[in-house]
Amino acid sequence: MRFYQFYRIHCFIIFFSCSIHFSCKKGKEPISGFTVHQRKQNAFFQDASKSPLTKKQLKSFKALPFFKLDSSFMVKAYLEKQKDENFKDIPTSTERIAKQRVYGLAKMKIKGETITLNIYQTESAFLNKLDNTLFLPFLDLTNGENTYAGGRYLDLIIPDNDSLIIDFNKAYNPYCAYNPKYSCPIVPRTNFIPVKVEAGVMYLKEN
């Protein structure tokens, strides 16, 4: 009886191990990534029905290049909410004009530097009461070296109070960095971070 119970537990462990690696099918490799977030990012880019990559890029795509995880780039910010609810025209990488407003000012310290960044809310998110997302586009000293020259983005969630956790390890490149058919909001110069934010997705020459 004990042997039977042990056998069942052993089988369950094998099944569970396969599940967290997405697939144990012969010839199918696990999705790359050190964190759940990174694995989700890679899975998204590999999915031909959703990926921003071109068909040619998809053929050779294996995984996104990430900086090493760095807890110092997970920062706590004070969010000063703005009263202005007027949405302004934001230029994009195409002729499209995006509608966004400054939801609040996020004040934080990164590598000893005191920084204030504009946190945006899109008009579509504002109109959809179920959409609690915010948008943080930013520039830093890595742009044009090992990150996209036009800056990177972060998606945030509206906090319950005036405290906001910003994890730059989740920073990603605009989709237009990979495919010009995408229309990406231009990162404002006011959101420049005067340090090297070596966290999140990189952008290498082969991209």
For the regions a language model picked out, list residue spans one by one.
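Bacterial Sec-dependent N-terminal signal peptides
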Residues: M1-S32
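Start-of-domain marker
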Residues: K26-N86
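Extended, aromatic/histidine-rich regions of cofactor-dependent oxidoreductases associated
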Residues: I31, Y172-N207
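A mature extracytoplasmic/lumenal domain signature
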Residues: L79, I119-E123, D140-T142, F168-Y172, ...
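Mid-length scaffold segments of soluble, non-membrane domains
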Residues: N86-A149
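Acidic, glycine-rich flexible loop segments
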Residues: F135-Y172
